Amino acid sequence: MQWYRFYCVVHDRIISGEDLKAEDDAAAIRAVRERDTGYDCELWAGDRRVATIPAEGEPIRF
């Protein structure tokens, strides 16, 4: 298990952030999607950006 942090973003400003623990990158992306924040989110593992997860549509993985 690995720790991740995701940030919800509006107009390039962070409006919230939350830690989560997941088995791998794919599981972390699913966990963010399941939260259905209604905002675009960025998922990070330490200083590595894992994905940008739009409010609608498919995640963009890095």
What are these regions (language model features)?
Residues 1-4, 36, 59:
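Generic intrinsically disordered, low-complexity segments enriched for polar/acidic and small residues
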Residues 9-10, 32, 50:
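Extended aliphatic helical segments
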Residues 24-40:
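A short, charged, amphipathic alpha-helix used as a generic interaction element across diverse proteins
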Residues 1-15:
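Short aromatic-glycine-(Arg/Gly/Cys) micro-motifs in beta-strand/loop hairpins
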Residues 15-17, 50:
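Local beta-strand/beta-hairpin segments that build beta-sheet-rich folds
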